[in-house]
Amino acid sequence: ESKLSGIGNTDFMQEVWYHKSFKLNNSWKDKKIFIHFGGVDYKCDVFVNKTKVGSNIGGQAPFSIDISKAVNFTKNNDLIVYVIDERCPGSMNPSPWYKGRFTPKKIAIAKKWALDKRRTQPRGKQSSFLHSYQCVYTRTTGIWQTVWLEAADKKHIKSVSIVPNLKSSCFEFTPDFSANVNDNFKVDITFKNKKISSSIFNTKVKKIKIKIPKPKLWSIEQPNLYDFVFTLISEKNNKTLDRVKSYAGMRSIEIKKNKVYLNNKPLYQRLVLDQGFYPDGIWTAPTDKALKNDIILSMKAGFNGARLHEKVFEDRFHYWADK
């Protein structure tokens, strides 16, 4: 539906298809190959070289699919994504305001669609009618966030949970690996490019605690962030199997007596209502800079946070909020 897509068709589209060809580098052989989708609205099936490799339901959450068994390295690979987006969930009883703007025929069409779906699919602020009205806007159908490929060793880091503990001045790490590995897990911590610590643990250790001397706290006024490099190292030959970069702030947040406390101090929240719609991209921000500027402009206007409204924002927005 968006202008940025190059199509700009705002009619109801219940089914859409995508096709793209890609070639893999030979250096990716013998590795696990994943395709990542930042967001696809709403139900989708993914095919690689005519083989169905996975499905997903949910328009705003990211997902990944292992496509290792379906790809080849001798010629182009064909990627096809089939999306079903059943618009207009729930019943619809148009008010006189709607009737004054839309023809009876358009209202009847929208009402029929709505009653058919019975609230089976959440829509957020997406319009049930052909056009925007009141505080609901043009629909988003299909792929609206970044899609990318990743090659990883068969033994790799799936995720690392990072929890700051202000009372003990430490970070608590809970790594998750792709297999039942018995190797080494290295954690390097820096602050503004200055080395804080470097530690190696066996992957059998479920929870890791690393103390931070004289921690610099994260706050809205001073968003101090510690940088981490997590490395999975083979026990057999000391080979690096996987490396992941991340970051976190040392801070505490809690609710006491109906007040929010940040770092043990009361925080009065002045929140801008952010609905995450863009004139040319609808749900999709036109650039990374646009995401960053939304945060900068709201802070210049005197706000210290945002109430993200009826949309799951992309990770990149939260990245800039942390910064």
Residue positions per predicted region:
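Short acidic/polar inter-strand loop motif in beta-rich domains
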Residues: 84-91, 233-241
